[in-house]
Amino acid sequence: MSSFIDITNVISSHVEANLPAVSAENVQSLANGAGIAYLGKYIGTGITMLAAGAVGLMQGFSTANAVQAVARNPEAQPKILSTMIVGLALAEAVAIYALIVSILIIFVA
């Protein structure tokens, strides 16, 4: 539990350090609606990267279940391993697509 809290503190301090300072120009752009687009861009990127986090979680579950299956039936290890690697590669493709979409949202939109 403490490692999760440490990770959250590191992330929040990194976000706070990289946020632009509030100035009169930033407040005026918020009033003009440009700030809402700016905010929406980063919220959309965060939502997109939730897919990458979910992929990481599911890859962990997949690997754990494959290890349990091999422990129960060591003779089936080659088939289980090959099936697991194909499944992990397909899942990793989703995470890569999410990363590409996030980069496009940040730099193109």
Swiss-Prot record:
One of its GO terms (molecular function) is lipid binding. F(1)F(0) ATP synthase produces ATP from ADP in the presence of a proton or sodium gradient. F-type ATPases consist of two structural domains, F(1) containing the extramembraneous catalytic core and F(0) containing the membrane proton channel, linked together by a central stalk and a peripheral stalk. During catalysis, ATP synthesis in the catalytic domain of F(1) is coupled via a rotary mechanism of the central stalk subunits to proton translocation. It is found in: Cell membrane. Belongs to the ATPase C chain family. This is ATP synthase subunit c. The lineage of its organism: Bacteria, Bacillati, Mycoplasmatota, Mycoplasmoidales, Mycoplasmoidaceae. It comes from Ureaplasma urealyticum serovar 10 (strain ATCC 33699 / Western). The chain crosses the membrane at residues 42-62, 88-108. One of its GO terms (cellular component) is proton-transporting ATP synthase complex. F-type ATPases have 2 components, F(1) - the catalytic core - and F(0) - the membrane proton channel. F(1) has five subunits: alpha(3), beta(3), gamma(1), delta(1), epsilon(1). F(0) has three main subunits: a(1), b(2) and c(10-14). The alpha and beta chains form an alternating ring which encloses part of the gamma chain. F(1) is attached to F(0) by a central stalk formed by the gamma and epsilon chains, while a peripheral stalk is formed by the delta and b chains. InterPro entries: ATP_synth_F0_csu, ATP_synth_F0_csu_DDCD_BS, ATP_synth_F0_csu_sf, ATPase_proteolipid_c-like_dom, F/V-ATP_Csub_sf. The record marks E92 as: Reversibly protonated during proton transport. Its main location: membrane. PANTHER family: ATP SYNTHASE LIPID-BINDING PROTEIN, MITOCHONDRIAL, ATPASE PROTEIN 9. Keywords: ATP synthesis, Cell membrane, CF(0), Hydrogen ion transport, Ion transport, Lipid-binding, Membrane, Transmembrane, Transmembrane helix, Transport. It is a multi-pass membrane protein. The keyword Cell membrane applies. It comes from the Bacteria. PROSITE patterns: ATPASE_C. The keyword Isomerase does not apply.
